């Protein structure tokens, strides 16, 4: 296929048009008075959202060069979302500001490679300063504030804070659709580990690509199963009971896996195989945890047990198991509560004894899985459209809260980014490197400008006053008042703010150093297709 090539200024200008189209669509959602964006869906009702990354992913432009520019900024939103789970709109606003400001200087003859150095240096200083002004999150109220700011809903803030209190900061929190109008919290005892199904043919819900087993038996072993004969006796006993089975083993492969899949597709019985979590000694400990939770036994040669002679009484039970491509969640295991409590105490004792941070972290993960349970946020709404929008906001709020617990919080509303300007200004840079630093300095003001603009105010006036205010004081766009942001509960997770800045700087630097852009030439359709000429159907006369 023939290619279209653009160079230097022409290339960058074409890509900038794409950047602007995407960023302008995303940035209208920023702040407490940000608007929504409606996304067309080919099937079902349209999606109304204010989630930056969801909007960015939907945008596909006709012009190939513009589309490349748009995709670069979509990458900023996507990467920020992957790492911090929120802050995608802020990241997009920062990236657009850096790219536009940088392009002015490159057009004026500045060296983009030296500008890049300045951008990287300024970003590094800004990130370090953010860490210094970050405050650890304390108590249920602080958690509720972070979630409420992210979701723009105080009620959601309270529910997420309660969920994290009930299952712990490391606990598993899932989001489901509710049948009613209200959003409520349900805490279910259970355990989740990061291993998915051995074959996608095992799924029972093809829309969500997950396998759901109701009241299954759970076979737990540290052996590799490649021959179906090894597990046939116990499988026959399970089939007689008419129940599904979850098989947790070192691996299930070859003939054994094929037999399980074929029987599932034929509807003979429902079995899902997953690999055992962890490695080495940690794997044995986690299998033992699962066995205690489900009331089963680990079938291992270490204890003189053999798969061929395994009995249905050695299998665990659970009220429900959900297996996705990457995770398995066991809900309401049938284990005895006193045995579970004893295991929890044993892990707590190990946490006290261990000196390794890594071991301590892994033990705490195991503890959360055994003792924490699974919190289910059931999202309610009047219509399907509202439901989708609320679900997205709650997902963002949950990610934001987790990020806050991890790295602390800073003043929200773009205030923290303006507060680090002083530190960035003190960088001793010269020439085009200083230009790079100035690009970041100008971009740091942009989120505040945009929040003010979305609230119908002049951004420059707000920014100038904010620079004169003491650190932590900022503008509450929801009420139009100047307040202590942290005391007013207007906070952002440090991790979200940091990730947004780092990813915006990274993509902007790449954009400015682009000198040629290559795209496929659009194909010209000749003749317009359609049916071939039938010659007036005259050739059918001989059939009479």
Swiss-Prot record:
One GO cellular-component annotation of the UniProt record comes to: cytoplasm
Q: What induces it?
A: By heat shock.
Instruction: Give one Pfam family.
Output: Cpn60_TCP1
Give the main EC class.
isomerase
Catalyses which reaction?
ATP + H2O + a folded polypeptide = ADP + phosphate + an unfolded polypeptide
Q: Name one GO molecular function term.
A: isomerase activity
**What are the record keywords, sorted?**
ATP-binding, Chaperone, Cytoplasm, Isomerase, Nucleotide-binding, Stress response
**InterPro entries listed in its UniProt record:** Chaperonin_Cpn60_CS (IPR018370), Cpn60/GroEL (IPR001844), Cpn60/GroEL/TCP-1 (IPR002423), GroEL-like_apical_dom_sf (IPR027409), GROEL-like_equatorial_sf (IPR027413), TCP-1-like_intermed_sf (IPR027410)
Which NCBIfam families does the entry mention? GroEL, PRK00013.1, PRK12849.1, PRK12850.1, PRK12851.1
- This chain's protein is named Chaperonin GroEL
The UniProt gene name for this protein comes to groEL
């Amino acid at each position: 296929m023939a290619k279209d090539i653009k160079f230097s200024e022409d290339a960058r200008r074409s890509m900038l048009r794409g950047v602007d189209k995407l960023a302008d669509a995303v940035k209208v959602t920023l702040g407490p008075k940000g608007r929504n964006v409606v996304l067309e869906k080919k099937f079902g009702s349209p999606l109304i959202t204010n989630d930056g990354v969801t909007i960015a992913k939907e945008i596909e432009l006709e012009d190939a060069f513009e589309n490349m520019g748009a995709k670069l900024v979509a990458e900023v939103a996507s990467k920020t979302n992957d790492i911090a789970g929120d802050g995608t709109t802020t990241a997009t606003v920062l990236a657009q500001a850096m790219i536009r400001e940088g392009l002015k200087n490159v057009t004026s003859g500045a060296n983009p490679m030296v500008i890049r150095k300045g951008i990287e240096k300024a970003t590094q200083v800004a990130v370090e300063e953010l860490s210094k002004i970050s405050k650890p999150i304390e108590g249920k109220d602080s958690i509720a504030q972070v979630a409420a700011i992210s979701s723009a809903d105080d009620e959601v803030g309270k529910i997420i804070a309660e969920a994290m209190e009930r299952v712990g900061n490391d606990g598993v929190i899932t989001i489901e659709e509710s049948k009613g109008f209200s959003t409520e919290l349900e805490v279910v005892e259970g355990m989740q580990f990061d291993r998915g199904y051995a074959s996608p043919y095992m799924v029972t819900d093809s829309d969500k690509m997950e396998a759901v087993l109701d009241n299954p038996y759970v076979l737990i072993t540290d052996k590799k199963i490649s021959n179906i004969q090894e597990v046939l006796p116990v499988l026959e006993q399970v089939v007689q009971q008419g129940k599904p089975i979850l098989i947790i083993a070192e691996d299930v492969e070859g003939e054994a896996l094929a037999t399980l899949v074929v029987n599932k597709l034929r509807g003979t019985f429902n079995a899902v195989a997953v690999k055992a979590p962890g490695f080495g000694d940690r794997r044995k400990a986690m299998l033992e945890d699962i066995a205690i939770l489900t009331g089963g036994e680990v079938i291992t040669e270490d204890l003189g047990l053999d798969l061929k002679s395994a009995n249905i009484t050695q299998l665990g039970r659970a009220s429900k198991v959900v297996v996705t491509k990457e995770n398995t969640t066991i809900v309401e295991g049938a284990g005895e509560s006193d045995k579970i409590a004893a295991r929890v105490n044993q892990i707590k004792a190990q946490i006290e004894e261990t000196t390794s941070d890594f071991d301590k972290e892994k033990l705490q993960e195991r503890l959360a899985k055994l003792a924490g349970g699974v919190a289910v946020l059931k999202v309610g709404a009047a219509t399907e459209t509202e439901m989708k929008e609320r679900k997205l906001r709650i997902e963002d709020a949950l990610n934001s809260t987790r990020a806050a617990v991890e790295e602390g919080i800073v003043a929200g509303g773009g205030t923290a980014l303006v507060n680090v300007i002083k530190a960035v200004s003190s960088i001793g840079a010269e020439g085009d490197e200083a230009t790079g630093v100035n690009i970041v300095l100008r971009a740091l003001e942009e989120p505040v400008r945009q929040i003010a603009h979305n609230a119908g105010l002049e951004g420059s006036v707000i920014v100038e006053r904010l620079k004169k205010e003491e650190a932590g004081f900022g503008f509450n766009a929801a009420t139009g008042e100047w307040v202590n942001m942290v005391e007013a509960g207007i906070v952002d997770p440090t991790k979200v703010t940091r990730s947004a800045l780092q990813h915006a700087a990274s993509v902007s630097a790449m954009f400015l150093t682009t000198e040629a852009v290559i795209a496929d030439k659009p194909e010209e359709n000749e003749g317009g297709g359609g049916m071939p000429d039938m010659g007036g159907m005259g050739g059918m006369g001989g059939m009479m």
